[in-house]
């Protein structure tokens, strides 16, 4: 009989530590709800002591998301643990994840503590966490560079104090698979009461080995995997959960392990995380990359057409990438639209369906054939609609080789229209300067990226931007068949998030 692997998602905590990523409460909740649909076992929602915003995010996820265990991170001290417990009060099932560093370099230079003091601190932390919840995880930070004998001692003491999960991180991504597998086995063999806890691993990707190390750990007795969607995280990121999950599924005869993941939600979850964080998925990324199921070689194409398994070890439909020969157009009705969305896995209420159908009709007037990719982009845009302080009413651009690029923009806020014109270094820059004149955010454009979401000369373009305002980053996304319009929508989407955060007030002297 196969053993079940616990999937612990830390996209909202470790993943959000990616440089330039800053999710607001609304976005964190959206990701958490999708992770619940994906079927992860544990959601690490944040680090409550880190900031009031982190506390509120963990609290909201704990109160509103049902299904997975909701986890909060805490250092091994009273203040952190009590704050985590407070944030988790509304959870259906809560877990406190407390940690302390155990490697000689960390104990000496960061903690300035002797090993015995570190052990005592860990035990006290676990006991305190246990007074708030029966579900307690203890992590030894920088475990792979720690002494195995000391790890066995501290893990044994933590389990005795009440820890139900023991986590073994490769914090700096230094391990190799053969080493890490042997390391896990040595800890399991050297910790007498290890059978009273689940052994977990948390691998970083500094050498590109996070997934390989995770799988090696599972081969050697670990039964919880910690990672993130798309492998995002600080530095080179974390183990990519979708890769671990599909490796276990595809190679089940080898690993004899299974998960409770709803695999058909993998692709949708990946897209959501990518869009909200602004971190684009590389085209050749395993499982969810744009080219993951693409075949350009004639020999490969011929083989796949004759028998898919000649060059594909999994079906794209398995992870939620659906293909269909039925093409919708401007003459397609509401019923056909709804039915196709259902086939793609989307169930919209009447209000959202009405809005999405109106957008579909508008797109069909500009685009001869509407593909599944178009529908996915359209419906996800509607499902993720962010509260709009400003909406784009009008955009006019003049540009060319002998013209000064100029943009005229009209935005609507509540019942008032605001219009401005500006010149710039190209049409996009001109549009952004005009929007900035109206909104007055004072934000800096930190990044700008374009990708084609669908194929063909009338394809939709997707623009992703990041605005930086007082050290915080705001991601915006816009989609349109006109890339300049998509660019304006993306910038405005990020501006609305700044306004949603309460800064700054809009200028009103230009009402028209």
Swiss-Prot record:
Biological process (GO), any one: L-leucine biosynthetic process
Name by which UniProt lists this protein: 2-isopropylmalate synthase
Family designation: Belongs to the alpha-IPM synthase/homocitrate synthase family. LeuA type 1 subfamily.
Superkingdom field: Bacteria
Record field: catalytic activity: 3-methyl-2-oxobutanoate + acetyl-CoA + H2O = (2S)-2-isopropylmalate + CoA + H(+)
Molecular function per GO: 2-isopropylmalate synthase activity; acetyl-CoA C-acetyltransferase activity; manganese ion binding
Positions of region (Regulatory domain): 391-512
Keyword Nucleotidyltransferase part of the UniProt annotation: no
Species name: Heliobacterium modesticaldum (strain ATCC 51547 / Ice1)
The Pyruvate carboxyltransferase domain, residue ranges: 5-267
Subunit structure: Homodimer.
The protein's annotated pathway: Amino-acid biosynthesis; L-leucine biosynthesis; L-leucine from 3-methyl-2-oxobutanoate: step 1/4
Presence of the UniProt keyword Metal-binding in the record: yes
A single GO cellular-component term on record: cytoplasm
Role of this protein: Catalyzes the condensation of the acetyl group of acetyl-CoA with 3-methyl-2-oxobutanoate (2-ketoisovalerate) to form 3-carboxy-3-hydroxy-4-methylpentanoate (2-isopropylmalate).
Localization annotation: Cytoplasm
EC number: 2.3.3.13
Pfam families given in the database record: HCS_D2, HMGL-like, LeuA_dimer
Keywords, sorted A to Z: Amino-acid biosynthesis, Branched-chain amino acid biosynthesis, Cytoplasm, Leucine biosynthesis, Manganese, Metal-binding, Transferase
């Amino acid at each position: 009989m196969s053993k079940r692997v616990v999937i612990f998602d830390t996209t909202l905590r470790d993943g959000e530590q990616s440089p330039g990523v800053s999710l607001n409460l609304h976005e964190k909740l959206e990701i958490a709800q999708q992770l619940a649909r994906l079927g992860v076992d544990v959601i690490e929602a944040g680090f409550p002591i880190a900031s009031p915003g982190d506390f509120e995010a963990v609290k909201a996820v704990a109160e509103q998301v049902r299904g997975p265990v909701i986890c909060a991170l805490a250092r091994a001290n009273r203040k952190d643990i009590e704050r985590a417990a407070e944030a988790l009060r509304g959870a259906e099932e809560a877990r406190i994840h407390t940690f302390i560093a155990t490697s000689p370099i960390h104990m000496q230079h960061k903690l300035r503590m002797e090993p015995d003091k570190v052990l005592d601190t860990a035990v006290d932390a676990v006991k305190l966490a246990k007074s708030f919840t029966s579900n307690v995880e203890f992590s030894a930070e920088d475990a792979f560079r720690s002494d195995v004998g000391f790890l066995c001692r501290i893990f044994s003491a933590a389990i005795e104090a009440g820890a139900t999960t023991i986590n073994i991180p490769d914090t700096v991504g230094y391990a190799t698979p053969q080493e890490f597998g042997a390391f896990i086995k040595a800890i399991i063999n050297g910790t007498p009461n290890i059978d009273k806890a689940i052994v977990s691993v948390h691998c970083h990707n500094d050498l590109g080995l996070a997934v390989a190390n995770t799988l090696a750990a599972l081969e050697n007795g670990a039964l919880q995997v910690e990672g993130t969607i798309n492998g995002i995280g600080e530095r080179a990121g974390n183990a990519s959960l979708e890769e671990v999950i599909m490796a276990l599924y595809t190679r089940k005869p080898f690993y004899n392990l299974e998960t409770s993941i709803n695999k058909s939600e993998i692709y949708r979850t990946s897209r959501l995380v990518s869009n909200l964080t602004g971190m684009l998925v590389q085209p050749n990324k395993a499982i969810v990359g744009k080219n993951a199921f693409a075949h350009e070689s004639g020999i490969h194409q011929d083989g796949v057409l004759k028998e898919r398994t000649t060059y594909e070890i999994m079906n794209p439909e398995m992870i939620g990438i659906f293909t269909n020969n039925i093409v919708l157009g401007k003459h397609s009705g509401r019923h056909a639209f709804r039915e196709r969305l259902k086939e793609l896995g989307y169930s919209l209420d009447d209000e959202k369906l009405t809005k999405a159908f109106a957008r579909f009709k508008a797109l069909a007037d500009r685009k001869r054939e509407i593909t599944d990719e178009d529908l996915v982009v359209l419906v996800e845009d509607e499902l993720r609609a962010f509260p709009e302080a400003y909406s784009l009413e009008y955009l006019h651009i003049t540009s060319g080789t002998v013209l000064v690029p100029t943009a005229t923009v009209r935005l609507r806020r509540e019942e008032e229209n605001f219009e401005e014109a500006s010149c710039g270094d190209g049409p996009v820059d001109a549009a952004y300067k005009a929007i900035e004149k109206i909104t007055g955010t004072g934000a800096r454009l930190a990044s700008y990226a374009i990708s084609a979401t669908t194929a063909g000369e009338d394809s939709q373009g997707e623009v992703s931007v990041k605005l930086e305002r007082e050290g915080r980053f705001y991601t915006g996304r816009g989609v349109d068949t006109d890339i300049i319009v998509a660019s304006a929508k993306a910038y405005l989407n990020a501006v609305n998030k700044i306004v949603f955060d309460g800064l700054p007030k809009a200028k009103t002297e230009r009402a028209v």
